[in-house]
Amino acid sequence: MNVTLLSQPRKTETCMINADFLTAPLPDPMDLPEAQTEGPKRFFNRELSWLAFNWRVLEEAENSRVPLLERLRFISISAANLDEFDTVRVAGLRELAVEGNTTPSDDGRTPVEQLSLINADARKLMQSQQAAWIALREELEAEGISVVTRKALTDADKAALNEIFLANVFPVLSPLAIDPAHPFPFIPNEGVSLALQMKREKDGRPLQALLPIPAQIDRFVRLPAPTGETRVLPLEELLLVHINALFPGYTLTGSCTFRVLRDSDLEVEEEAEDLVREFETALKRRRRGHVVRLQVSTGAPEALKREITEQLHVIGDEVVEVLGMIGLARLKELVQDDRPDLMWPNFTPRVPERVQDHEGDMFNAIRQKDMLLHHPYETFDMVVRFLAQAARDPNVVAIKQTLYRTSNESPIVEALCEAAENGKSVTALVE
């Protein structure tokens, strides 16, 4: 049969598929094997199902029909998803396991059994993410976007990097010695650090040090490049190039990069008298949650690795050795607006004609007739405009809204806050 598939808005293509399943009779539920209708085996495990979804996200990074920089974005999304999964879902299961909780999930697995399966699958997923990044890195280089190492730097590169380092990086660094006289610093959630093994030049005395990498600095430093090309250096490589400026009189003998993921599961007492204060306290407590995953670069000196794991109180499968880049979520920083040829074409959603007829007045447009918006084909700006107008309209006395997820600087939240400041009753149910 002929089937028309909608691939992008207003573009169609026709292909032949076998769709006999559409006309096949459905099985009688009573004829299904008992194992499929009764007992825990009829359920998918919630956590393993989520990992399967994230495998599907990563598949888009391996899909050659997807533009190159969009594939890079999918690796970043997959890595960020896994980070969130570790800090919330895995953290919750670990807490249950530590408490000795053996209550099975709907599919019949205890927290310990689930953690074992999760760790095995998550490690495979991380390896596949690194493999996808290595393959994509070669394709990017063929398109004139190169991620170089410090060994490939020219004298001109080093001169340019020295200016960047002194002006933008050096002032915000805080190198720290690791010894009994200096307590191990607090490493925030998703924090990346360099662990260094050095010896003093004058007498060979050993020194272990830590160099936390500030999150506000871009993960990749742009290098001089011919017109039409892009060359970048990972920030940790830049720091190693300038290690003598940070530790004068010492020689580097070994190093590794590591990253910390902390328990970010939020627990609040919903019956608390002051819910706002309860959330503020919970958020502060979450910043210092215990470590649920430690990622360490492969080949780390054993003494450094031992020191880090002991200081962060992590053991066993909480430690993951990474062969490749640590913190793949920040690959999104390589997506460049000046390479539209490597991204999906821009899609401009339509503005409903009725809103235009009423010169943007949402209330008048809705008063004429109820409005149904289809996202992303019709712009979400209409929702933002509706709330912003409601926040300022003297006839609006209350706003009640459900919020699933918002951006860091959400215009929705801004409009709700403005409405509350204008004396309106505002209620939001937040996921």
What function would you assign to each model-found segment?
Residues 2-431:
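N-terminal localization/anchoring segments of enzymes in phospholipid and broader phosphate metabolism
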